[in-house]
């Protein structure tokens, strides 16, 4: 999902009460599951089996369940429940986008 504006690492970490690690200048422009992630996206990982593929993906901000070395050019947010944090953000951003839409759409002919 594309976001209606860029969100900073700090903003995202505060929204989910997580600990930010890495490049504080990184911003998110989208949020997606790892199999469809794009550069600028937020992704999550909550199982050691998937740490390497997620940390080496093009995702810019990764929500993870334990502290680890942050790859260059990325940021991590440590959270005890990455899946729940990711779902919260998805719903939060969806509401933000819906609020940007006009309540009275006009169809032009």
Language-model segments: which ranges?
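Terminal amphipathic alpha-helical/low-complexity segments used for targeting or macromolecular assembly
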Residues: 1-106
């Amino acid at each position: 999902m594309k976001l209606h504006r860029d969100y900073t690492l700090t903003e995202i970490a505060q929204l989910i009460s997580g600990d930010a690690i890495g490049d504080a200048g990184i911003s998110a422009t989208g949020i997606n599951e790892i199999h469809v992630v794009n550069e600028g996206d937020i992704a999550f990982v909550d199982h050691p089996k998937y740490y390497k593929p997620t940390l080496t993906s093009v995702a810019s901000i990764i929500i993870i369940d334990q502290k680890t070395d942050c790859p260059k050019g990325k940021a991590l947010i440590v959270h005890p429940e990455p899946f729940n944090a990711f779902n919260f953000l998805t719903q939060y951003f969806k509401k933000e986008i819906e609020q940007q839409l006009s309540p009275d759409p006009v169809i032009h002919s």
